Amino acid sequence: MSILVKNNIHWVGQRDWEVRDFHGTEYKTLRGSSYNSYLIREEKNVLIDTVDHKFSREFVQNLRSEIDLADIDYIIINHAEEDHAGALTELMAQIPDTPIYCTANAIDSINGHHHHPEWNFKVVKTGDTLDIGNGKQLIFVETPMLHWPDSMMTYMTGDAVLFSNDAFGQHYCDERLFNDEVDQTELFEQCQRYYANILTPFSRLVTPKITEILGFNLPVDMIATSHGVVWRDNPTQIVELYLKWTADYQEDRITIFYDTMSNNTRMMADAIAQGINEVDPNVAVKIFNVARSDKNEILTNVFRSKGVLVGTSTMNNVMMPKIAGLVEEMTGLRFRNKRASAFGSHGWSGGAVDRLSTRLQDAGFEMSLSLKAKWRPDLDALELCRQHGRDIARQWALAPLPETTQKTAPAEEITTCAAADLGPKMQCSVCQWIYDPALGEPLQDVAPGTPWSEVPDNFLCPECSLGKDVFDVLATEAK
């Protein structure tokens, strides 16, 4: 099945609704993906890219239903990765002499995957053209390291379509092909996820390359990507977003992620978040347990954030393995213009937080002071965590924050008001976790200042996951 893109250009790619892992298992494609291949029928017939190798046979069969394979004059390979050029072996078995236009680096990659050095390769570089008849040409633009050394884009004159390779794409599967036809929230979420997890390391290359392409002074009516939608409605909107994302991007957002063995580090994360919110309620704070969260969502939030707090328990004197792996991935992504702080709990010796701080600094983050707690944090330790959050909120503020002021009411009056307004603290009889009405439980949408009587009946203890019926009034407050 083909889809008309524009005039004599048809999409002949493959949708992949089921794929959930990309680049091994490093990228979770939660909304599937597509492998976009395009067939151009002018005086010359041109195929731009193929599909993932697992769809090779199906792709060639479908292509044969669109055109006699022998009538394909040229094959353009913008990128040699297997999700772009994976069907070449199956296709070239049918038309072995058809010329393949690609960069010099692509020949090495294609031969490395397919092992056919005898194929009819034609090397192109930036500014080279290929006449396809009817007054139209293909213009080639090398885009090395966006995101492989072999990458290039292809521009078609007359129709003003830019075949952009991986740039401006997204792992997003939909029966509809064009950007104006799909759910806009989903689309732009996947665009940002794609950029944050794949193209961030090459941000410094993106702006010069876009500037170079714009320097050709060629109109762009459509951007036909290798994955996801074709941008036909205001295609420059995604270009403008890329230029924004390349500029050491950050929002007024803080990401907290952690791993924990006994919930001690989780308690610290909650308290730090409370402190941040207390001082700067306008900053967005997102908390993730790495063992229970989508790694790529965490990394996308780091990309969006002005700073990140990373927590780990100590295990054999080092950080938890999932934290170590995620920090290593952040090192490779080379985030810029971001601050960081390490925190965590330990038992007898510690070591993980210091190691984590060093790794975050090596990853290019501007470091703030770290925070450690021994064993399970008590009320005093949790207050230190909240104070750490308050300090972080002030240090990382994008604009000066108003000084917090407290009313100087007598201590007896404050105590009386608190008791009268909020009621007693409650303690879980199973794990001893304490609910403080003054603090609430933000992770369950229980706001600070919520008395126990107003806590929803479906409330669960954050540590042992049991319900309200196992809670008793804290012994020190029982009358």
UniProtKB/Swiss-Prot annotation:
A single MF term (Gene Ontology): FMN binding
Kindly tell me the pathway this chain contributes to. Answer: Nitrogen metabolism; nitric oxide reduction
Per the annotation, which location comes first and is thus the protein's main one? cytoplasm
Region of interest called Zinc metallo-hydrolase, as start-end residue ranges on this chain: 30-210
Q: Does the keyword DNA repair apply?
A: no
The places in or outside the cell where this protein is found are:
Cytoplasm
At which positions is Fe cation 1 bound?
H79, E81, H147, D166
Which InterPro entries does the record cross-reference, listed alphabetically? Anaer_NO_rdtase_flvorubredoxin, Flavodoxin/NO_synth, Flavoprotein-like_sf, Metallo-B-lactamas, ODP_dom, RibonucZ/Hydroxyglut_hydro, Rubredoxin-like_dom, Rubredoxin-O_OxRdtase
Boundaries of every Flavodoxin-like domain copy: 254-393
Residues binding Fe cation 3, per UniProt: C428, C431, C461, C464
The disulfides recorded in the entry are none
Amino-acid positions noted as binding FMN in the UniProt annotation, renumbered to this chain: 260-264, 342-369
How is this protein annotated for GO cellular component? cytoplasm
**Binding-site list for Fe cation 2:** D83, D166, H227
| Cofactors (names) | Fe cation; FMN
Role according to the record: Anaerobic nitric oxide reductase; uses NADH to detoxify nitric oxide (NO), protecting several 4Fe-4S NO-sensitive enzymes. Has at least 2 reductase partners, only one of which (NorW, flavorubredoxin reductase) has been identified. NO probably binds to the di-iron center; electrons enter from the NorW at rubredoxin and are transferred sequentially to the FMN center and the di-iron center. Also able to function as an aerobic oxygen reductase.
Subunit organization: Homotetramer.
Q: Which family does it belong to?
A: In the N-terminal section; belongs to the zinc metallo-hydrolase group 3 family.
NCBIfam families the record matches: PRK05452.1 (NF003954)
Q: What is this protein called?
A: Anaerobic nitric oxide reductase flavorubredoxin
Query: What organism does the record attribute this protein to?
Result: Salmonella paratyphi A (strain ATCC 9150 / SARB42)
Tell me the lineage of the source organism. Answer: Bacteria, Pseudomonadati, Pseudomonadota, Gammaproteobacteria, Enterobacterales
